Amino acid sequence: PTADAIAAKKMENGKAAIDFPDQSVIRRVSSADRISLQDIARERVDVICDRMHRLPDEFLDELKNGLRAILEGGNGSQHRDEFFILQKLVQSRSDLTAKTLIRAHRVQLEILVSINTGIQGFLHPSISLSQTSLIEIFLYKRCRNIACQNQLPADECSXDTCTNNNGFCNLCMCVICSKFDFEVNTCRWIGCDLXSHWTHTDCAIREQLICMGPSVKSGSGPSEMVFRCQACSXTSXLLGWVKDVFQHCAPSWDGDALIRELDFVSRIFHGSKDQRGMNLFWKCDDLKEKLKSRKMDSKAACRAILMVFQELDLDNSKSLENAESGRLIAPQEACNRIAEVVQEAIRKMEFVADEKMRMFKKARIAVEACDRELADKAREAGDLKVERQKKKSQIEELERIVRLKNAEADMFQLKANEAKREAERLQRIALAKSDKSEEEYTSNYLKQKLSEAEAEKQYLYEKIKLQESSRLSQSSGDPSSMLMYSKIHDLLYNGPPKADSQSNDCHPFRTNP
């Protein structure tokens, strides 16, 4: 396959470094409400979901940060052991189905998917997948590669590797190790010409899938270095594939990338026994040394390796011509060769048609995924709209209640002011009536006392008068008796003013102000 085919199959996103935010301050959470990663991996989905709804967002972020630290493995074997325990707990459960996971809390689902896949990208705040996508990834119905996200099996592949390997995606994962990365336009990956499965070059070398074999084009003749696909057991030529990669991608590589790619080619053709493979191996080693020692720049090395491929093609053409020039071709053999050329052309046309059909299916799957994503977003937007309308109606109801209470408060304040004024008026009336009654009582009391004093004075006057008349009759003409009579007479007539004054001074009631 060419580099364009590689780029079509591999994801073109670079592997970005993830900067995690600093841990934020967490509000105090009681020990009874706390949740650990072991609780999430072990307890029922609905129980953990209910507990998570009562926890603050800061605590949930702390849970995700803790799992990210474990997945990073910064603490060595301790973190690896913790992750294996969590993964074993999750993968041994039979209750984690689509029916139960649909009711899971968002953070709970992200943590479960990260534990099951071992990928911390699902915990990153800038990556937001729909709940449906997360459930499909957990159940191995969607590719766990965030940059791929194809439905599984990809391209409806019916190979045993795709149908039996849970979560395997033939568009972005290695057939042997089932891992993916973001390397494109490189000899790090080897693609199968027939099944379009991909394999790491390192994995293929380790599993001895790169070896000498018969020529792929003719099926006979001199052997060459070939790659045997583990998924379909078919073989693919390596020299032509390496040449296509270098012709399409080498001009854009820098010095370090070129050294790395030359190293891959050297390792691929290390065990080659044909002349072309050995020449390529020797030339790659020579160019690597020159690049490392700064004796040649990357552009010159790129031109040199491309020249090597041209020379190898020329040598191959000459060797074939020399081999065929020594004998005459029979008519039947000529017809067979023509038929082979036609069949090869038909095979290539069918391959191109199949490739276009796979690309069409992939595009259709991508469109369907986008439609589902849009439907999910529309449903979420509808839920948010309903929630917003509900909140708006609640706010309006609260505002109406507040206005009603304010009106009641104003009314009660008005009545209180009126009652206060009425009480003050009644108090003034009561004080006025009290003062008037006191004055009347005092006047009547003084009049009564004055009448009593007058009556007593009149009584004494009459009594003295009678006594005087009796004494005059007994002793007429006595001067001392006449003097006593005049004193008593003065005392009676001068006494009432003093009595009135004493009665006023000794009156027990208060005077008017």
UniProtKB/Swiss-Prot annotation:
Its main location: nucleus. This is OBERON-like protein. One of its GO terms (cellular component) is nucleus. PANTHER family: PROTEIN OBERON 2 (PTHR21736:SF37), VERNALIZATION-INSENSITIVE PROTEIN 3 (PTHR21736). It is found in: Nucleus. It comes from Pisum sativum (Garden pea). The gene is PVIP. One of its GO terms (biological process) is transport of virus in host, cell to cell. Required for the maintenance and/or establishment of both the shoot and root meristems, probably by controlling the expression of the meristem genes and of genes required for auxin responses. Involved in the development of the basal pole and in auxin-mediated root and vascular development in the embryo. Confers sensitivity to turnip mosaic virus (TuMV) probably by promoting viral movement and multiplication via interaction with TuMV VPg. Disulfide bonds: none annotated.
